[in-house]
Every structure is written in C-alpha cells, then in structure tokens.
Amino acid sequence: MSDSETEETTKQSTEPVDNAWSLKIPTFKAEDNPHGMVEESSFATLFPKYREKYLKEVWPLVQQTVAEHHLRAELDLIEGSMVVKTTRKTWDPYIIIKSRDMIKLMARSVPFEQAKRVLQDETGCDIIKIGNLVHKKEKFVKRRQRLIGPNGATLKSIELLTDCYVLVQGNTVAALGPYKGLQQVRDIVLETMNNVHPIYNIKALMIKRELMKDPQLANEDWSRFLPKFKNKNISKRKQPKSRKPKGEYTPFPPAQPESKIDKQLASGEYFLNKEQKQAKRQQERVAKQAEAAKKQDERRNKDFMPPTEDSPEQNRKRPSEASKVDVKALKAKLLKANKQK
C-alpha cells in the first residue's frame, strides 16, 4: 500500500460520522495474533441447584462450542460452578470475555441455544438488576409482572422491536442481542420499575421504526410524533413545619418539674406506711369501680326511660305569622288596579 492510500484511509477513519451504529467493526482474525496468549485466563461463575440437571445435559455441547474458539470449559457439580479457560491455541483475546458472559447467562436460566449467540461479534448481553429499584415487595412483583404482560405479550413485543432475547428471572432481567437493542431494553426495564408503563416505550419504538422509513423526516425532530407520558399521581405538597412560639427571654433557668416524691409529699402520701398506702389504693379502686358501675347502669336504663311529652298548651295550634293579612297593602293594591282600568 502506498503512502497516499494510507493517508486517505486515516483521513476517512477520523472524519465525523452521522450514525455511529452504521459503522462496521473490523474483524479480528488469527493472523492478527499469531503468537496466541501469553498466560492462561479463566473465569468462573456459580449456578443454583435447580440448574444442575439442565447444565449436566447440555455440557458436552458447551464444551464443543467453546472448543471451536480454542477454549476449555469445566463443570464442577460439587461446588456448583462453571469455569472457562484459555488454551495455548487461543488467539482471540476477547473471546474469554464472551464465554464468561455465556456461562453467566446460562446460570441465570437462559437456554444454551440462546446463550451461545453471545460468542458472535455483533451480539452482546446485559444483565439488569431490578431487585433494589423498588422498596416494597408487592410493588416490585406488580411492576415485574407488568414487564412480562398478559401471557408474555409485552415481553414478546419488546423482543420483536429490539431484536433481543429477554428473560425475566427473579431479581434480574437478562437481555441478549445487538448492542443498540440492549440499550433500548435497559431503558424500558428501568422506566418500568420506576412506574412508567412499558406500553409508552413500545409505542415510541414502533413510531421510530416507521419514521426511519421516511427519508424526508430523517433530519427532523421526532419528539412531536412520540407519545408523552403524564404522571397522574400528584405528590402532596410538603407541609411547613409548625414552630412553637418562643416565650419571653428570662435569664433564669426554668423551674424544675415536680418529681414523684414531691407529689407524694404535697399529698401527704409519702408519710403513710405500707398498709395505709394499700388501703388508700384499694379505696380509690373501689370508688372508681362504683363510678363506672353507675355510668353503666345509666346507659342500660336509658332505653327504659319514658319519653318527655309536651304540655297541652304547647300542643295548641298557634296562628302562624304567614296567615296574617296586611290590610293597608291590600287596599293600595286594589286602588292601583282600579286606576289602571
């Protein structure tokens, strides 16, 4: 390659790009790293007990898949761990990271047929932790179910729009697919856990997909076409803290409150002996019980008390004020009517 061609290639690679997603990542080949890896690298991850049976069945396929990339995989059923290691023939330095992501996905209940896709260059994965985003357990379960939807319809629509495989499992959401789709999945999941229904983001993705097809709207602002979410939960205004009015300033400290002994000295109870104190308490208790019994009897006898009747004088019909006739006003009205005739 001549110097002019090298300069032209460098110039093209440093120019600003309108759409970074359209750029193609250059492939890494075995010729680029002929000497292989200097030292062995390994990654291990634990898996739950219920995944042991499935992993034991598919492990020969896992070993066969990683062997194509010159890696070695080990399954330890006693410790409950999966390990991937590089070999002397490994030439791709990033494939060990990809294989680590694969065993992480398999530990989180992603099937092997989907997890092995992460070994491809244009495919990545994202494990979104949602367990600590909502404090109350009931709200967390409700919002997580909202993400799945009835019969998994919402989750399926997210997968179709983002070209990603999405699995909701426990306190995490595992996503697998192209990097742009992973970014969209993370936004939808986080907003859903923040009490924004996923249907708003799904509608926005559908509208964006249609707008991309129109070349006239390629360089315009799309915000006027997208749905706007309005929060209907109006937060209550924080009430101002009520402050007690300060009293007049005095240089003297406040009076000491009376203690229990001071109250007993004032009432004379302090000088009584033990028997007298017990007798006084018993007397107060009896008086209190007698008062409570009296109130209870009054409440019971209330239903048997005869109602009060009005006296005969009160029952007489009194002429109402409305029945009185104003004679003067009536005469004036008649005279006015005669004059008009």
UniProtKB/Swiss-Prot annotation:
Location relative to the cell: Nucleus, Nucleolus
Basic and acidic residues bias spans: 272-303, 313-327
GO biological processes: rRNA processing
GO MF annotation: an example: RNA binding
Cysteine disulfide partners in this protein: none
InterPro entries: KH_dom, KH_dom_type_1_sf, KRR1-like_KH1, KRR1-like_KH1_euk, KRR1-like_KH2, KRR1-like_KH2_euk, rRNA_assembly_KRR1
Keywords from the named record: Coiled coil, Developmental protein, Nucleus, Ribonucleoprotein, Ribosome biogenesis, RNA-binding, rRNA processing
Predominant place of localization: nucleus
Regions annotated as coiled coil: 271-341
Self-association state and partner proteins as the record states: Monomer. Component of the ribosomal small subunit (SSU) processome.
Functional summary from the UniProt entry: Required for 40S ribosome biogenesis. Involved in nucleolar processing of pre-18S ribosomal RNA and ribosome assembly. Binds to RNA. Required for female germline development, cell viability during eye development and for survival of dividing cells and epithelial cells during early wing disk development.
Family per record: Belongs to the KRR1 family.
Name of the protein this chain belongs to: KRR1 small subunit processome component homolog
UniProt source species: Drosophila grimshawi (Hawaiian fruit fly)
